[in-house]
Design a protein with these regions (language model features):
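Structural motif
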Residues: 25-26, 71, 109, 142, ...
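Histidine/lysine/aspartate-rich catalytic loop segments that bind and position anionic ligands
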Residues: 93-122
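Glycine-rich phosphate-binding active-site loops on the catalytic face of alpha/beta enzymes
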Residues: 76-87, 115-127, 152-186
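Short, acidic/polar
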Residues: 12-24, 64-66, 99-105, 154-159
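Hydrophobic faces of well-ordered beta-strands that scaffold small-molecule active sites
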Residues: 4-12, 29-33, 59-61, 76-78, ...
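Conserved, mostly hydrophobic/aromatic
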Residues: 31, 68, 106, 114, ...
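N-terminal active-site wall of soluble small-molecule enzyme domains
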Residues: 24-89
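Alpha-helix-loop-beta-strand connector modules within alpha/beta enzyme cores
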Residues: 44-60, 88-100, 128-152, 186
């Protein structure tokens, strides 16, 4: 029941969303801090960053270059709506995309990895439609960068991820809903 991938990306909205102490030390895990609400203090983020360093997790900040520099994050996560170019900052960049046009935009921004959204059907009201394994594999063959699937990944379709032509996977809401999924993955 294990999924063997080279990279695991976990989205968090605050530092209390995930307890890093329960995860095993692993170089393959990357945590993306994506806070759209109330900004946490720099002290809390620095403490969380140090915990990630101890566990050998990579830590990325979403769409905030100054905060990424202040926290000494491993890189910057660029959302699909963010069109700025960060080539001159010498950071590890991860992008997010929903279609082929956005993938090429992220390549121009300098992203080495793109998290491509909705692999499976999700339970959100306004977000309908999904790619499926076959369409994702066809798109990933045409891209020169690493595409990481996101969306709809849950306990019931974990084994389908072995068929996905990708070096990793990304989890957003499943970690918050059912933390036990992390035991099956890592």
């Amino acid at each position: 029941m294990f999924i063997i991938k080279n990279n695991y990306f976990l989205y968090i909205e605050n530092t209390q969303s995930i307890n890093v102490d329960f995860l095993k030390s692993n170089k393959k895990i990357s945590i993306i801090y994506r806070n759209n609400g109330i900004q946490e203090s720099l002290v809390k983020l620095s403490i969380f960053r140090n915990k990630c360093k101890i566990k050998r997790f990579k830590f990325y900040i979403a769409n905030n270059l100054q905060l990424a520099k202040n926290c000494q994050a491993d890189g910057l996560y660029i959302s699909a709506y963010n069109k700025k170019k960060y080539l001159k900052y010498n950071l590890n960049l991860i992008g997010s995309a929903h279609n082929y046009k956005e993938i090429h935009g992220k390549i121009k921004q300098g992203c080495k990895t793109v998290i491509f959204s909705r692999l499976f059907k999700t339970s959100y009201k306004n977000k309908k439609g999904s790619l499926g394994v076959i369409k994702f594999n066809l798109i990933s063959q045409n891209c020169l960068i690493n595409l990481i699937p996101l969306g709809g990944i849950n306990i019931f379709n974990l084994l389908k991820l072995n068929m996905v032509n990708s070096e990793g996977l990304a989890l957003l809401s499943e970690i918050k809903k059912k933390p036990a999924i992390s035991n099956r993955l890592f």
